[in-house]
Amino acid sequence: MDLGAHFDREGAKLALEKFIQDRVNESKDAKETSVDNVVVHEVDRQASNRREWKLAALSGSEVVPEEVAFRLHGVLAKINLAPGEIAHLNAYKASSLTQRVQLVGLGSHAFDDMLLNTKVVTDILRRHLGGQHSPVWKIGEGYGDLQMNCSCLYLTKAFNRPEKEVPFGPGVDPFKKFARYKPQGYIHTAANVVKYFKRVDEEGKRVLYECFPGTFRVGNIVEVQGSVIAFPVKDGMVKMVFQMNTLILEDASFSKAAEHARAREYNPPQRPMQLKRKSWYEEEDEDMEVGGARRKFKDLRLETAHSYVG
């Protein structure tokens, strides 16, 4: 879905710039991991036979079990989320069923800098893998500037040592469509979970509330949390993807304004139709006692009512 001609791109860009700068200021006091302390950690995926690598942080001489988390902020340019995305599933594409979004900055320098800084992951992987693999980090272009795709598979193919199956989150599988893939060995694990939130201002505080994936619209300003995963592909290459685990709605005002503008264009306001009051009688006899006739109708209704009651 396109942002459309009614979307205030300049306003959204400026709002995104301010939002990213505010998040940077908030994180200055937070504990950050130096690039020198980041190492590549091979993931032990029990439900998959594919090799995967993630980033982990060093604490002294040991690797902290928590992976290095990333936070990205941008404007939603494309959405592929439940329930619309899974309303008509193809039974032969279970391995590619993905919840994903695409972020753009609409020319925001803060957004471009944020994405370019993530390329440091390529250097870290290259040092770890040496000449064995060549990492590929693809950041495309959309709407004239950089874009980032963030995704997470709905299902995992279970092999010899299946992971624990977990229930789907609120609004993710309302039609119970994924049950058909369980006989094929596909399950929903903790690695497939994406949590959806919207941030609300309450008494000067920003509070998170869980929401359905169907809440999100193209044009929303969002925060995506997740990790970078690398895995080998053909010809000795390593593909890197941003696997999201949290999507937060921060600002929906620009998408709502665009929707209202489109609605006004296709449904312009119309003048209310003037109705003329028409008499019950085509012609009134001058000798007719209208008041008496009305009294007769009134008495008739009362008599009828009494007859039913009696």
Residue ranges and their predicted role:
Residues 173-247:
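Extended serine/threonine-enriched, polar tracts that run as long, contiguous segments within proteins
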Residues 1-180, 235-283, 294-310:
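OB-fold ssDNA-binding interfaces and closely related basic DNA-contact patches used
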Residues 289-293:
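Acidic, serine/threonine-rich low-complexity intrinsically disordered regions
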